[in-house]
Structure formats: C-alpha cells, structure tokens
C-alpha cells in the first residue's frame, strides 16, 4: 500500500514530534506543514535541534526555498496560512491532517481543514465534541464516515490502557488519578499573568503546581463502562519531559497485587504490546525519554492496601509516546477506508 500522505497544522512541540515520527516510518509520508508564525528557516532550526529528544540524526535537512523543506531528497511543502480553509491541500495531496495548533479543537473549527480539501482531521488534543480514540483501547470503534477525530490527551493515552486491563480483569468500582506531569509550553518561565488559572501562572521551573485535568473523566468517553467512575488531578513539576500516572482504584473482584501485576504483564506481551509496557526495574523518569509506548506500568512503584484497594503507577513520555499514537491512529483510520 502506498504511504498515507499527511499534513501538519501547527509546528509546536507535538507538531514537530509527529513530523519526526512520520519521517522515520514507511507507512506514512509527510507532505506539508502549515504554521503562520514560523518562517521556513526558523522551522528548520526548530525541527533540527530539540532540547529533549536531541538533534535530528536521520535525513539531511535543508531549505530548498521559502516554501519547501528538503529531508534528504524528500520535499515537504510549507504554508503560512492562519485560516486552514486557505491551505491548498490538493496541491500537496495531504489527505490526513494533524491539527496540532491547540486552537481548532472542536468539530466546527477543525472542519475548516475539510473545506480546504482535507479528507480527515486528527486533533492532537482532547475535544469537547469530536469523537476521541485511544489506540489499543477503542480505535476499532472508528468508522469511515467520521471525518474529524481526537487522539485524546497524552495522559488519557497513558491511563486508558491500564484502566482497561484492570476493569476487564477485576472490575473498577471507582478510582482517582493523579498525574505528575512535566512542564508544557503553556506554562510560565517566571511568575506571570494567568487569569483563568492563578497557580498556573507561577514559575514552572521551580514550583510544584497543582492543576486540573480532564484526562481521567475522558477515559469514560473511550471506555463507557467507566463513565463516572474516575476523576483526577495533575501536579505540574519542573521536568521537561516524561510524566507518571498514579491510579488508585477500588476493585469489584478481590485480587492480590501479584495477580494484578501478572495480568498487566500478560496484556503488555499480548494484545497491548507496543502500547502498554511493563517493568520491574528501578526506573526513574529520564529512563523513558523517547519511549514510544503509551503507558509503562512500574511494578515496583505500586502498592496495595488490601485485595480491593490498590495504587498503580505507570510512566509515559508525554511528547514522543503521544506523537507516535497520533501516527498510529492515522494508519488505523486509513485501513478502515
């Protein structure tokens, strides 16, 4: 099958990393990037050098002209349009658009890409009205008549596979999630204005900042049987990448911690291989930089109070793992056409 032609709208953290993932795969072809705020030469610099994931070491990258980047001999067309309707998709052949600006996150706004000639839009963020899919959990529910979808959030992608295994095997009565989450681009380097979230305006580099997250509730959208059973919060911490989910649940069926570990290990080596990981090593956050899995269960970090009440810990590279799932979702969608 010919590679799936994709375009990226918004060349921020996720946009650039989706590009890195796509350019290292044979099943997709990056043909276009749109960002109205970045010149082609600056785009090249931002892509080539990355403080977390290192310098680009694959194809040689250079600017052919102000509208074209060359990855080796592979041209990628660059646009700078604010309105997605104005991007001439037909000229590049881009059918699947990764919407990673953080602006066009509902169906009405994302539909501008369809008006511009795109076939499908994948929002790289939670959406209030677009159907959400988590690869490994509910992607099989995707139907070809859905043209705008959401890849949910990085935290939902970590939590959902773990919650699915636990619920399928033992049943979840209720649970609370905390994610200890690395800094993101929306935070402040020093104390600054943040009218909607006062604590969120405090300096990211030397504070632990409590924050809200809809990730746990969103699990109920991809796993309806858990709707209303989970909620959660976040602590933003001064690390640049890799986050960790702490899921504390009450179980329907009694299970020892050893039985829970065995169930997760079995799934990580079976149906969820490549999505859900399992480790008994004495790991820390930097050990997962560049890990493409959505969720890596830390067997040594969890604890059980009794056979019905347990705390489970799972790591995720909130940048690289999530960006890999965006591309995986595109490949799955194309297979359903």
Swiss-Prot record:
<feature type="binding site">
    <location>
        <position position="35"/>
    </location>
    <ligand>
        <name>NAD(+)</name>
    </ligand>
</feature>
<comment type="pathway">
    <text>Carbohydrate degradation; glycolysis; pyruvate from D-glyceraldehyde 3-phosphate: step 1/5.</text>
</comment>
<dbReference type="InterPro" id="IPR036291">
    <property type="entry name" value="NAD(P)-bd_dom_sf"/>
</dbReference>
<dbReference type="InterPro" id="IPR020831">
    <property type="entry name" value="GlycerAld/Erythrose_P_DH"/>
</dbReference>
<dbReference type="InterPro" id="IPR020828">
    <property type="entry name" value="GlycerAld_3-P_DH_NAD(P)-bd"/>
</dbReference>
<dbReference type="GO" id="GO:0006006">
    <property type="term" value="P:glucose metabolic process"/>
</dbReference>
<dbReference type="Pfam" id="PF00044">
    <property type="entry name" value="Gp_dh_N"/>
</dbReference>
<feature type="binding site">
    <location>
        <begin position="153"/>
        <end position="155"/>
    </location>
    <ligand>
        <name>D-glyceraldehyde 3-phosphate</name>
    </ligand>
</feature>
<dbReference type="GO" id="GO:0050661">
    <property type="term" value="F:NADP binding"/>
</dbReference>
<comment type="function">
    <text>Key enzyme in glycolysis that catalyzes the first step of the pathway by converting D-glyceraldehyde 3-phosphate (G3P) into 3-phospho-D-glyceroyl phosphate. Essential for the maintenance of cellular ATP levels and carbohydrate metabolism.</text>
</comment>
<dbReference type="Pfam" id="PF02800">
    <property type="entry name" value="Gp_dh_C"/>
</dbReference>
<feature type="binding site">
    <location>
        <begin position="13"/>
        <end position="14"/>
    </location>
    <ligand>
        <name>NAD(+)</name>
    </ligand>
</feature>
<dbReference type="GO" id="GO:0004365">
    <property type="term" value="F:glyceraldehyde-3-phosphate dehydrogenase (NAD+) (phosphorylating) activity"/>
</dbReference>
<comment type="subunit">
    <text>Homotetramer.</text>
</comment>
<keyword id="KW-0560">Oxidoreductase</keyword>
<feature type="binding site">
    <location>
        <position position="82"/>
    </location>
    <ligand>
        <name>NAD(+)</name>
    </ligand>
</feature>
<protein>
    <recommendedName>
        <fullName>Glyceraldehyde-3-phosphate dehydrogenase, cytosolic</fullName>
        <ecNumber>1.2.1.12</ecNumber>
    </recommendedName>
</protein>
<feature type="binding site">
    <location>
        <position position="318"/>
    </location>
    <ligand>
        <name>NAD(+)</name>
    </ligand>
</feature>
<dbReference type="GO" id="GO:0006096">
    <property type="term" value="P:glycolytic process"/>
</dbReference>
<dbReference type="GO" id="GO:0005829">
    <property type="term" value="C:cytosol"/>
</dbReference>
<feature type="binding site">
    <location>
        <position position="236"/>
    </location>
    <ligand>
        <name>D-glyceraldehyde 3-phosphate</name>
    </ligand>
</feature>
<feature type="binding site">
    <location>
        <begin position="213"/>
        <end position="214"/>
    </location>
    <ligand>
        <name>D-glyceraldehyde 3-phosphate</name>
    </ligand>
</feature>
<feature type="site" description="Activates thiol group during catalysis">
    <location>
        <position position="181"/>
    </location>
</feature>
<keyword id="KW-0520">NAD</keyword>
<comment type="similarity">
    <text>Belongs to the glyceraldehyde-3-phosphate dehydrogenase family.</text>
</comment>
<dbReference type="InterPro" id="IPR020830">
    <property type="entry name" value="GlycerAld_3-P_DH_AS"/>
</dbReference>
<dbReference type="InterPro" id="IPR006424">
    <property type="entry name" value="Glyceraldehyde-3-P_DH_1"/>
</dbReference>
<feature type="binding site">
    <location>
        <position position="184"/>
    </location>
    <ligand>
        <name>D-glyceraldehyde 3-phosphate</name>
    </ligand>
</feature>
<feature type="active site" description="Nucleophile">
    <location>
        <position position="154"/>
    </location>
</feature>
<dbReference type="GO" id="GO:0051287">
    <property type="term" value="F:NAD binding"/>
</dbReference>
<dbReference type="InterPro" id="IPR020829">
    <property type="entry name" value="GlycerAld_3-P_DH_cat"/>
</dbReference>
<keyword id="KW-0963">Cytoplasm</keyword>
<keyword id="KW-0324">Glycolysis</keyword>
């Amino acid at each position: 099958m010919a590679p799936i032609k994709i375009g990226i709208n918004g060349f921020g953290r996720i946009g650039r990393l989706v590009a890195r993932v796509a350019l290292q795969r044979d099943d997709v072809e990056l043909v276009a990037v749109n960002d109205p705020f970045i010149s082609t030469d600056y785009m090249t610099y931002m892509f080539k050098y990355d403080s977390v994931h290192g310098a680009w070491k694959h194809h040689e990258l250079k600017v052919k002209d102000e509208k074209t980047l060359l990855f080796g001999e592979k041209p990628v067309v660059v646009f700078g349009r604010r309105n997605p309707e104005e991007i001439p998709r037909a000229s590049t052949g881009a059918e699947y658009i990764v919407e990673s600006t953080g602006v066009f996150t509902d169906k009405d706004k994302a539909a501008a890409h369809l008006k511009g000639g795109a076939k499908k839009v994948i929002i790289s963020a939670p959406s209030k009205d677009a159907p959400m899919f988590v690869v490994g959990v509910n992607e099989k529910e995707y139907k070809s008549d859905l043209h705008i979808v959401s890849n949910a959030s990085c935290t939902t992608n970590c939590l959902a596979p773990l919650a699915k295994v636990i619920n399928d095997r033992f049943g979840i009565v209720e649970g609370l999630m905390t994610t200890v989450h690395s800094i993101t681009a929306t935070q402040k380097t020093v104390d600054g204005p943040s009218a909607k979230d006062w604590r969120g305006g405090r300096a990211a580099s030397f504070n632990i900042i409590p924050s809200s997250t809809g990730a746990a509730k969103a699990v109920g959208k991809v796993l309806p049987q858990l709707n209303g059973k989970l909620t959660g919060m976040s602590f933003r911490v001064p690390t640049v990448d890799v986050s960790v989910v702490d899921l504390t649940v009450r179980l329907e069926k009694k299970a020892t911690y050893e039985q829970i570990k065995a169930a997760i290990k079995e799934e990580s080596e079976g149906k969820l291989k490549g999505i859900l990981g399992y480790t008994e090593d004495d790991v820390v956050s930097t050990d997962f930089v560049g890990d493409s899995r959505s969720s890596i269960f830390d067997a040594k970090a969890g604890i059980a109070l009794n056979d019905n009440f347990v705390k489970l810990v799972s790591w995720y590279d909130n940048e690289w793992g999530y960006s890999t799932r965006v591309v995986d979702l595109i490949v799955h969608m194309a297979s359903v056409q």
